[in-house]
């Protein structure tokens, strides 16, 4: 769990996302409160519950991007899901408890990766011994092994092919649902899980280069040194206390006014979400998981429906409400130039791989922003995503001919941009911009 201060979290988000200060502050405070709760002891620690967040704002203003960046910052089990993917319990489809099962798998992956780093030195030596066994045999003399070990570490044997024994494992085994046992009880059952012990001791021979053998064996040796039971328990603890779920497209499951009749992917899903967000115990194949202290961040554009169309109980379980503002022309210019991996920087880097030096002038950036604003206002406002479409149109010809122009420097100014998107700016052909 990261211990960034709210100011540091906002500063980190500012590197990638323009504007939306209120939303950044809300998620920063929520993330810091996770750390604060960990510092409490005993009864008070159990009593402090997370304040779940509802982010409201038009499409393309940064709701999903905030969640993506937050996941990297959190250092905690984090899962982003679309609310529209779930159906009411009892119907065909995924029920909402699958969210927690998926979150546990994310947690196990995080903890296992950390434990692999902890045992990396020992695993490295064990993997090296297995490569030496493949090169000179298990019964070779220590003198021979030492000589080959030096060559191996010097990289002299990298291109030599060896045959190694690796775990056959049960990966790739099919998944199936047990009839009469819906996901609420156990979820999809993997044959690999059921037959894991039977397959656990099986190995298969593979012929690989020495340089490729070491990474393969390193992961295998690290997993041998890890206590899998302890890993699972640690992961469940991390999920229960630090887990974060980002529920996107929550507006799509709101029951709109004037509609009646059953809809298994709308109100039923909201009802199923209530206990999950309030706090319940979900059965997983790794054991029961309590959701009381999992933080839920919901977001939606609410173009057609309103937040008040959600069930009142669900609204009450999302007490912190943040509205994100629509982006302006000035925001578009900043998105193109100031963010760490802006579209301009990405385009320059991509053309650089072809040996083409791309120079996009400031007035070209202004022109791209102008076109994006104009098309957003006349067709459909899809926010910052419009910039990607305009940028692709501007660079379309160059992207196609770049392999033939290696060594050239291509300058793009406002006139070049207007020439490429002239028909679009005049509303002559907007079909390419309707996503």
Curated annotation (Swiss-Prot):
<comment type="subunit">
    <text>A double ring-shaped homohexamer of HslV is capped on each side by a ring-shaped HslU homohexamer. The assembly of the HslU/HslV complex is dependent on binding of ATP.</text>
</comment>
<dbReference type="InterPro" id="IPR050052">
    <property type="entry name" value="ATP-dep_Clp_protease_ClpX"/>
</dbReference>
<dbReference type="InterPro" id="IPR027417">
    <property type="entry name" value="P-loop_NTPase"/>
</dbReference>
<dbReference type="InterPro" id="IPR019489">
    <property type="entry name" value="Clp_ATPase_C"/>
</dbReference>
<dbReference type="InterPro" id="IPR003959">
    <property type="entry name" value="ATPase_AAA_core"/>
</dbReference>
<feature type="binding site">
    <location>
        <position position="385"/>
    </location>
    <ligand>
        <name>ATP</name>
    </ligand>
</feature>
<keyword id="KW-0547">Nucleotide-binding</keyword>
<comment type="function">
    <text>ATPase subunit of a proteasome-like degradation complex; this subunit has chaperone activity. The binding of ATP and its subsequent hydrolysis by HslU are essential for unfolding of protein substrates subsequently hydrolyzed by HslV. HslU recognizes the N-terminal part of its protein substrates and unfolds these before they are guided to HslV for hydrolysis.</text>
</comment>
<keyword id="KW-0963">Cytoplasm</keyword>
<comment type="similarity">
    <text>Belongs to the ClpX chaperone family. HslU subfamily.</text>
</comment>
<dbReference type="Pfam" id="PF00004">
    <property type="entry name" value="AAA"/>
</dbReference>
<dbReference type="Pfam" id="PF07724">
    <property type="entry name" value="AAA_2"/>
</dbReference>
<dbReference type="GO" id="GO:0043335">
    <property type="term" value="P:protein unfolding"/>
</dbReference>
<dbReference type="InterPro" id="IPR004491">
    <property type="entry name" value="HslU"/>
</dbReference>
<keyword id="KW-0143">Chaperone</keyword>
<feature type="binding site">
    <location>
        <begin position="60"/>
        <end position="65"/>
    </location>
    <ligand>
        <name>ATP</name>
    </ligand>
</feature>
<keyword id="KW-0067">ATP-binding</keyword>
<feature type="binding site">
    <location>
        <position position="18"/>
    </location>
    <ligand>
        <name>ATP</name>
    </ligand>
</feature>
<keyword id="KW-0346">Stress response</keyword>
<protein>
    <recommendedName>
        <fullName>ATP-dependent protease ATPase subunit HslU</fullName>
    </recommendedName>
</protein>
<feature type="binding site">
    <location>
        <position position="248"/>
    </location>
    <ligand>
        <name>ATP</name>
    </ligand>
</feature>
<dbReference type="GO" id="GO:0016887">
    <property type="term" value="F:ATP hydrolysis activity"/>
</dbReference>
<dbReference type="GO" id="GO:0008233">
    <property type="term" value="F:peptidase activity"/>
</dbReference>
<dbReference type="GO" id="GO:0009376">
    <property type="term" value="C:HslUV protease complex"/>
</dbReference>
<dbReference type="GO" id="GO:0005524">
    <property type="term" value="F:ATP binding"/>
</dbReference>
<dbReference type="GO" id="GO:0036402">
    <property type="term" value="F:proteasome-activating activity"/>
</dbReference>
<dbReference type="GO" id="GO:0051603">
    <property type="term" value="P:proteolysis involved in protein catabolic process"/>
</dbReference>
<dbReference type="InterPro" id="IPR003593">
    <property type="entry name" value="AAA+_ATPase"/>
</dbReference>
<feature type="binding site">
    <location>
        <position position="313"/>
    </location>
    <ligand>
        <name>ATP</name>
    </ligand>
</feature>
């Amino acid at each position: 769990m990261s211990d960034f201060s709210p100011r540091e979290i906002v500063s980190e988000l500012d590197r990638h996302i323009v504007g939306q200060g209120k939303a950044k502050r809300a998620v920063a405070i929520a993330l810091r409160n996770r750390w604060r709760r960990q510092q409490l002891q005993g009864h008070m620690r159990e009593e402090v519950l997370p304040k779940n967040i509802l982010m409201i704002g038009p499409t393309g203003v940064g709701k999903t991007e905030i969640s993506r960046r937050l996941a990297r910052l959190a250092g905690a089990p984090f899962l982003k899901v679309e609310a529209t993917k779930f159906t009411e319990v009892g119907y065909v489809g995924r029920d909402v408890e699958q969210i927690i099962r998926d979150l546990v798998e994310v947690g196990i992956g995080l903890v296992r990766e950390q434990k692999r780093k902890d045992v990396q030195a020992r695993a490295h030596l064990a993997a090296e011994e297995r490569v030496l066994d493949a090169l000179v045999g298990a019964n070779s003399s220590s003198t021979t092994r030492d000589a080959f070990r030096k060559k191996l570490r010097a990289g002299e044997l990298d291109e030599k092919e060896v045959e190694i024994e690796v775990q056959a494992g049960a990966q790739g085994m099919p998944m199936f649902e047990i009839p009469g046992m819906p996901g609420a009880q156990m979820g999809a059952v993997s044959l690999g899980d059921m037959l894991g012990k039977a397959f656990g001791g099986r190995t298969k021979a593979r012929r690989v280069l020495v340089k490729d053998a070491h990474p393969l064996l390193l992961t295998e040796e690290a997993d041998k040194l890890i206590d899998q039971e302890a890993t699972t328990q640690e992961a469940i603890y991390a999920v229960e206390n630090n887990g974060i779920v980002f529920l996107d497209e929550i507006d799509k499951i709101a029951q709109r006014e004037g509609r009646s009749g059953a809809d298994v992917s709308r109100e039923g899903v909201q009802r199923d979400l209530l206990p999950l967000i309030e706090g319940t115990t979900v059965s997983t194949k790794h054991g029961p998981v309590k959701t009381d202290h999992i933080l839920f961040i919901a977001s939606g554009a609410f173009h057609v429906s309103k937040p008040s169309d959600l069930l009142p109980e669900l609204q009450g379980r999302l007490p912190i409400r943040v509205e994100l503002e629509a982006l302006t022309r000035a925001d578009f210019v900043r998105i193109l130039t100031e963010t760490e991996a802006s579209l301009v920087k990405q385009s320059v880097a991509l053309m650089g791989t072809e040996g083409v030096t791309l120079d996009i002038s400031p007035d070209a950036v202004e022109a791209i922003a102008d076109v994006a604003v104009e098309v957003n206002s006349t067709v459909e406002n899809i926010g910052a995503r419009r910039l990607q479409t305009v940028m692709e149109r501007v660079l379309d010809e160059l992207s196609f001919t770049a392999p033939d122009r290696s060594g050239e420097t291509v300058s793009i100014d406002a006139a070049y941009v207007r020439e490429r998107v002239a028909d679009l700016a005049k509303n002559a052909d907007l079909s390419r911009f309707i996503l």
